[in-house]
């Protein structure tokens, strides 16, 4: 049984979040019940996003991930739909990273390119977040996936000068220009 007593106050102010967290705690040993609860939670994406932003929600979802492929797929679908909102928050960012790693371990080759495409499509938004967003865009460029790099280059094209004046943004511009020189994409 998972002990989340120390996180009780993080969801106590919002009754809906508290009810979901309590339910997760109650069914944490039953995979079938966790699947039902995961489906119920992700049916309201706003609730899911708010839930995984709390430490209690993060820990609850973290324990459910990896227990079954069905649970992971349910969470992946909501992550795809709410990617920009989840990727810039501390705890939900860790959930996204964990689910990417789970699908990579299972050799599901479709998830990683899909996430890279989402990073590319949201590159401008992500560069506005200096902690996670810029680092994520930089890592996506380092993967050297041509499609992702082209998406990033196109989304940031008219913002190179602005980014070059930012401490971490200049790294992205430098990497895009070096990738462009190597002939991977026309930057």
Swiss-Prot record:
InterPro entries: ARM-like (IPR011989), ARM-type_fold (IPR016024). The pumilio repeats mediate the association with RNA by packing together to form a right-handed superhelix that approximates a half donut. The number as well as the specific sequence of the repeats determine the specificity for target mRNAs. Sequence-specific RNA-binding protein that regulates translation and mRNA stability by binding the 3'-UTR of target mRNAs. The lineage of its organism: Eukaryota, Viridiplantae, Streptophyta, Embryophyta, Tracheophyta. It is found in: Cytoplasm. Keywords: Cytoplasm, Repeat, RNA-binding, Translation regulation. GO terms for cellular component: cytoplasm. The keyword Repeat applies. It comes from the Eukaryota. Pumilio repeats lie at residues 20-42, 43-78, 79-116, 117-154, 155-187. This is Pumilio homolog 26. GO terms for molecular function: RNA binding. It comes from Arabidopsis thaliana (Mouse-ear cress). The keyword Ligase does not apply. One of its GO terms (biological process) is regulation of translation.
């Amino acid at each position: 049984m998972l002990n989340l007593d120390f996180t009780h106050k993080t969801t106590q102010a919002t009754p809906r979040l508290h009810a979901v967290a309590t339910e997760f705690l109650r069914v944490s040993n039953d995979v079938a019940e966790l699947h039902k609860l995961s489906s119920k939670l992700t049916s309201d994406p706003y609730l899911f996003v708010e839930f995984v932003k709390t430490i209690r929600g993060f820990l609850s979802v973290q324990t459910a991930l990896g227990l079954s492929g069905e649970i992971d797929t349910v969470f992946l679908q909501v992550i795809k739909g709410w990617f920009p909102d989840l990727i810039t928050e501390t705890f939900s960012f860790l959930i996204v990273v964990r689910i990417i790693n789970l699908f990579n371990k299972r050799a599901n080759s479709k998830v990683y390119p899909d996430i890279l495409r989402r990073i590319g499509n949201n590159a401008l938004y992500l560069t506005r977040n200096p902690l996670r967003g810029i680092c994520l865009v930089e890592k996506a460029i380092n993967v050297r996936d041509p499609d992702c790099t082209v998406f990033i280059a196109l989304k940031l094209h008219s913002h190179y000068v602005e980014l070059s004046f930012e401490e971490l943004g200049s790294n992205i511009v430098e990497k895009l220009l070096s990738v462009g020189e190597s002939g991977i994409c026309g930057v």
